[in-house]
């Protein structure tokens, strides 16, 4: 692994990091013991940047990340989580867990307001048991998540006027180190970059061996604005990971066309 930095803030991280959605029992159940082994093995291998979110297992991932990182020197790792969803206690029978195979008994709901963002951060700190978060991502303001244009526009406006305002205040007062956007579409990330001053963007699945459309306008804009890119879901949620039993793309079953394309890539790269 190589040392890299988030340019504007000089946060030193490795070029490989650990996204902890799986610790929220994403697609399969993981025990607390297994989760601890994974986190500590990643740390022992030199990974020093860990990302989580309230959504992941409806708080479970944050609990597990915090439970293990609490025991380590706080200066030895960089930690990020996300804002935009709050968690409300719920009857387990009434929770739509989707792809989460278990998790905590809370229902997530969207809130990109100033007050909602401040509350979200405080609740994340309590779940983590860690009072310092380095990077905060404004999470999922995109069509993939919200589907309808009026909802995307509503939450984008709310995030600019509310969530970003809260994060900028925290950054200005050195309570956090960096502001980011965690998003599934580079087009929406571009809109944020044109409106507000972010330090980095966590882009999920849009710059991989299968997709490079973000090269045309998004990457040049990041370079111009000195915004670093954190590439999430580099295996496009499974199809590029080499496991023939997990041919998912964009969190759903891949089409035959995409599967054929991946098989062609394997021949090119001899894997």
Regions found by a protein language model. Name each.
Residues 89-100, 244-246:
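Short, flexible, mixed-charge acidic loops at enzyme active sites
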Residues 29-42, 113-127, 184-191:
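Short, acidic/polar
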Residues 3, 34, 141-271:
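Beta/alpha (TIM)-barrel catalytic core signal, keyed to glycine-rich beta->alpha loops juxtaposed to Asp/Glu
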